[in-house]
Design a protein with these regions (language model features):
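Glycine-rich phosphate-binding loops of nucleotide-dependent enzymes
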Residues: 1-174
Length: 174
């Protein structure tokens, strides 16, 4: 197995708190990791550092053995890193497919995208209708949209930041 991601001495400080203090983490290709801790322990901050949504104050990140500076979520996606945030970023007045298309290259054909959404959702056992408007979806269905959006990029690393925090116990079981 190869090292997919390595963090060395990642530190992120905010005016009133140190969110990450010299964190080291190694993720091998094919591994699954869970980061556990109390509220405010810096878990989400660390995930956002990996995804390029937050810049660390110090430390190094290596991707497939190469040192990288992930300065934005776009740069993370280009490397093959996707993230599902604990809070949705969907537009209620758009359809599932239209929401997902917003993060894709210009010129993406909606009909082809709808088929990819359907295929990906089925592959992972996530019921999803690409033509439904987001305002008609349950919270669980909105979370599925976010997960399928991340999976469509065929990521080498998928970050799930508390993906079940907004779901009912019944939806979590499903």
């Amino acid at each position: 197995m190869t090292v997919r991601l390595a963090l060395q001495k990642i530190t992120k400080k905010y005016p009133a708190v140190v969110a990450n203090d010299s964190v080291d983490l190694t993720v091998m290709s094919g591994e699954i990791h869970a980061i556990l801790g109390e509220n405010g322990a810096g878990k989400s901050t660390l995930m956002k550092v990996i995804y390029g949504a937050v810049r660390p104050d110090s430390g190094q990140m290596f991707w497939n053995g190469q040192q990288v500076n992930v300065g934005s979520p776009s740069a993370a996606r280009q490397l093959g890193i996707s993230m599902v945030f604990q809070h949705f970023s969907l537009f209620d007045t758009l359809t599932v497919a239209e929401n997902i298309a917003l993060g894709l290259p210009a010129g993406t054909k909606l009909g082809e995208l709808e088929q990819r959404i359907t295929d990906t959702a089925r592959q992972y056992g996530l019921d999803l209708e690409p033509q439904r408007h987001v305002h008609t979806l349950s919270v669980g269905e909105c979370q599925r949209v976010e997960i399928v959006r991340a999976l469509l990029s065929r990521p080498q690393l998928l970050i799930l930041d508390e993906p079940t925090s907004v779901l009912t116990p019944q939806a979590v079981e499903k």
